[in-house]
Amino acid sequence: MAEIAAQLVSVERPLWVGTATSVTAQTTEGEIGVLPGHEPLLGQLVENGVVTIRTNTGEKLVAAVQGGFLSVSSEKITILADSATWASEVNVADAESRKQSAETEHDKAVAESELRAVKRMEA
């Protein structure tokens, strides 16, 4: 299967660098799937979106992202997120509680994004 270098980086920390067979992200233009050999592009990630990376080892990595950009070149896919949390790091009970008690729409949306990432990871 074809492979491409990829990385997911947030303002807080680098999350992952490796080789991927596909990347799926939610952009302001809609959900996009990127495979090796894809035409170059630059996309804006939606607030409260989900990014899925399929690694060359078959692993499925899923993260909740809060805005940022997706850059695709012939050599690499780069996801630059304002904020990102791995679905595997999400405490579902805590996220549900934060969603219910959120005082702002932003806080509620962040919790919802984390819960969507967990569901996508389990799918």
Swiss-Prot record:
Membrane topology: Peripheral membrane protein
UniProt-listed InterPro entries: ATP_synth_F1_dsu/esu (IPR001469), ATP_synth_F1_dsu/esu_N (IPR020546), ATPsynth_dsu/esu_N (IPR036771)
Keyword Transport: yes
Superkingdom, taxonomy of origin: Bacteria
Pfam families linked: ATP-synt_DE_N
GO cellular component: plasma membrane; proton-transporting ATP synthase complex
Annotated region (Disordered), positions in chain: 96-123
Cellular compartment(s): Cell membrane
CDD domains xref list: F1-ATPase_delta
An MF annotation (GO) of this entry: proton-transporting ATP synthase activity, rotational mechanism
Keyword terms: ATP synthesis, Cell membrane, CF(1), Hydrogen ion transport, Ion transport, Membrane, Transport
Family affiliation: Belongs to the ATPase epsilon chain family.
Oligomeric and partner information: F-type ATPases have 2 components, CF(1) - the catalytic core - and CF(0) - the membrane proton channel. CF(1) has five subunits: alpha(3), beta(3), gamma(1), delta(1), epsilon(1). CF(0) has three main subunits: a, b and c.
Role, per record: Produces ATP from ADP in the presence of a proton gradient across the membrane.
NCBIfam families: ATP_synt_epsi, PRK00571.2-5, PRK13442.1
Protein name from the UniProt record: ATP synthase epsilon chain
Species annotation: Corynebacterium jeikeium (strain K411)
